[in-house]
């Protein structure tokens, strides 16, 4: 696999995610301040360039409140088990949700040796 070329390198992570338009469950698989990979258990109705809204639930740390994030789909990869989207963070409007997002990124950046 090639070397990481993102401005904000992604780190392995794990948090529950729900595609809000259809209540489809999934998981955040990697994360950075500018994007994430979200894997769903079934295909969702979004294509490259579309905006989606996902609720993120950090079960590992109840101090991190669930938050909602708008994501721009940049890549779609489908296999037998997962429908994965490479996404760019588009918006987190609420300051408390932005704080929860920052805490989640910091947690995984620290635990996986990221920046």
Feature map (PLM): residue ranges:
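Short, surface-exposed secondary-structure edge patches
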Residues: 8, 41-46
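C-terminal output/interaction extensions
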Residues: 80-115
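Short coil/turn motifs at secondary-structure junctions
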Residues: 59-61, 76-78, 92-94
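Short beta-strand-centered aromatic/proline hotspots
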Residues: 25-28, 67-76
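N-terminal helix initiation/capping motif
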Residues: 1-36, 102-115
């Amino acid at each position: 696999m090639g070397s990481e070329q993102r401005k904000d390198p992604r780190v392995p992570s794990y948090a529950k995610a729900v595609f809000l338009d259809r209540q489809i469950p999934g998981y955040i698989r990697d994360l950075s301040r500018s994007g994430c990979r979200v894997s769903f258990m079934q295909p969702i109705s979004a294509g490259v360039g579309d905006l989606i809204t996902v609720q993120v639930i950090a079960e590992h740390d109840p101090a991190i409140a669930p938050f909602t994030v708008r994501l721009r789909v940049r890549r779609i990869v489908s296999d037998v088990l997962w429908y994965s989207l490479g996404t760019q963070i588009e918006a987190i409007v609420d300051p408390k949700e932005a704080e929860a997002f920052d805490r989640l990124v910091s947690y995984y950046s620290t635990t996986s040796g990221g920046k």
